[in-house]
UniProtKB/Swiss-Prot annotation:
This is Phospholipase C D. Belongs to the bacterial phospholipase C family. Its EC number is 3.1.4.3. Residues 492-514 are annotated as: Disordered. It comes from Mycobacterium tuberculosis (strain CDC 1551 / Oshkosh).
Length: 514
């Protein structure tokens, strides 16, 4: 394939379409992403081969929920009593303290509303996730949901998808590297986890505007005062930007907190780096222009609009399109792509079940428990001081010429691991990171395969734009209602059969630094 064309469209035409129309324009001509990317040159076997790190965060999915059936992972073939959760009876379709529900498939092809694709939004609050975790026993998922969700929606947390339902996600897992021990940072909702993604803390001691334990309807503005990773990067002379989608106006940042930098007092100065690089850049227009002009910064945080975020009840297909969209942009400039690592992660599990019990800090561990005097005065706390994390497992892809798949990494990571990757690569320390968290999580260098030359050949990733187009209109009623806990419930099948994992492909383990 010509290096100047993507899917039959020239680089310049493609970038112009992205800048002019965003996702809507792209959907009109979406095709196979790239059948073959461009040669990335000889491998030197060093992390320094990677000059650009792009962090792309989606919303609210657990690892078992997406990849419990994926081959080579700690998934449904694992022998564990935790797959049998008590609290709902599939036979009677009712709450039942002794009833057992196992993971069951959300079939995205059934029904006029595709209710398997657009399911109700589970409770994923600080309280609900701590109650699900249940002191590390991890056996209280259904009773925790029953406190805030209707009876018919309570078992939603046990639903999962297969390759048939989210084909693009599975093809990405086959083409690159997947982490099956990547945990969200907080046993709680979106905003606390995104704060960890940017700064490695929620200010549990309450010294600088925290602690933040909930996700308010409106994003806080200049409320927090602790140091964030972009400030450390600026001080070290390492370029960075936060690219956020603005195509839907204020709605673009609903649920995803795309303007997160403005939550910090340091952003009050319009001349500051935080405003110039953390507020002004847009996605996809500014990002696409920077890629084409060879001025992509060393570090990019990218936040798509809420309709592409995968937040329930938005369909996963729309999120697949968003991931492929950012890949198209990077591939439009081979000189940039060959030196780039794209890490796609999910802010938190969204309330969806995962059988792996996360590591958590012992009581009293500095920085890992809320220590303000009156915990009941902290919004969303429910009187719970912690542990803060780790939270539950979420999907994570490492997409790069240096992470060719199918590969699987079993090392433990969380959102602060992305920041530690920058620390290792550029020598810029992560602010606020606790000694405990540093001791239990890695820096993600093990996700790269530097022992072999980089491989840029790509599979055909289907037609995600067209797939999203066919799904979204049918999901509109349930997507709108499901986001506010009023969607059409998905009936739990009876009798239940424990799902199994795929047997192929076989997944290798990357070399890491060599």
């Amino acid at each position: 394939m010509s290096q100047s064309h993507i899917g039959g469209v020239s680089r310049r035409e493609f970038l112009a379409k992205v800048a002019a129309g965003g996702a809507g324009a792209l959907m009109s001509f979406a095709g196979p992403v790239i059948e073959k990317a461009y040669g990335a040159g000889p491998c030197s076997g060093h992390l320094t081969d990677i000059e650009h790190f792009v962090f792309f965060m989606q919303e609210n999915r657990s690892f078992d929920h997406y990849f419990g059936t994926l081959s080579g992972t700690d998934g449904f073939n694992t022998v564990s009593p935790l797959f049998q959760q008590k609290g709902w009876n599939p036979m009677t379709q009712a709450l039942d303290a002794t009833g057992v529900t196992m993971p069951y498939r959300f079939d995205t092809t059934r029904g006029p509303f595709l209710d398997g694709a657009c399911v109700n939004d589970p409770d994923h609050s600080w309280v609900a996730m701590h109650e699900s975790w249940n002191g590390g026993v991890n056996d209280n998922w259904l009773p925790a949901q029953a406190k805030t969700r209707s009876a018919a929606h309570t078992p939603t947390v046990m639903g999962y998808y297969t390759r048939q339902d989210i084909p693009i996600h599975y093809l990405l897992a086959d083409a690159f590297t997947v982490c099956d021990r990547y945990f969200c940072s907080v046993l709680g909702p979106t905003l606390p986890n995104r704060l960890y993604w940017l700064s490695a803390t929620i200010d549990p001691d309450g010294q600088n505007g925290g602690p933040e334990l909930q996700s308010p309807t409106f994003q806080p503005v200049r409320r927090f005062g602790w140091r964030i990773m972009p400030q450390n990067l600026s001080d070290a002379g390492v370029s960075w930007k936060v690219y956020r989608n603005k195509t839907l106006g204020p709605i673009s940042s609903v649920l995803t907190y795309g303007s997160l930098v403005t939550s910090f007092k340091q952003s009050a100065d319009p001349r500051s780096d935080l405003v110039r690089f953390g507020v002004a850049p847009s996605y996809p227009a500014s990002f696409a222009a920077d890629v084409l002009a060879n001025r992509l910064p060393r570090v990019s945080w990218v936040i798509p609009n809420v309709l592409e975020s995968e937040h329930p009840a938005v369909p996963a297909a729309a999120g697949a399109f968003a991931i492929v969209n950012i890949l198209r942009i990077l591939l439009a400039n081979p000189a940039v792509w060959e030196k780039t690592a794209l890490i796609v992660s999910y802010d938190e599990n969204g309330g969806f079940f995962d059988h792996v019990v996360p590591a958590t800090a012992p009581a009293g561990t500095p920085g890992e428990y809320v220590t303000v005097p009156d915990i009941d005065q902290v919004p969303g706390s429910g009187g719970i001081r912690g542990p803060i994390g780790l939270g539950f497992r979420v999907p994570c892809f490492v997409i790069s010429p240096y992470s060719r798949g199918p590969q699987m990494v079993h090392d433990t990571f969380d959102h602060t691991s992305q920041l530690r990757l920058l620390e290792t690569r550029f020598g810029v320390p992560v602010p606020n990171l606790t000694a405990w968290r540093r001791s239990v999580t890695g820096d993600m260098t093990s996700t790269f395969n530097f022992a072999v030359p980089p491989n840029s050949s790509w599979p055909n990733l289907d037609y995600p734009g067209l797939h999203a187009l066919s799904t979204v209109p049918q999901c509109v009623p349930n997507a709108a209602l499901g986001t506010i806990n009023r969607g059409i419930p998905y009936r739990v099948p009876d009798p239940q059969i424990m799902p199994t994992q795929e047997t192929t492909p076989t997944r290798g383990i990357p070399s890491g630094p060599c």
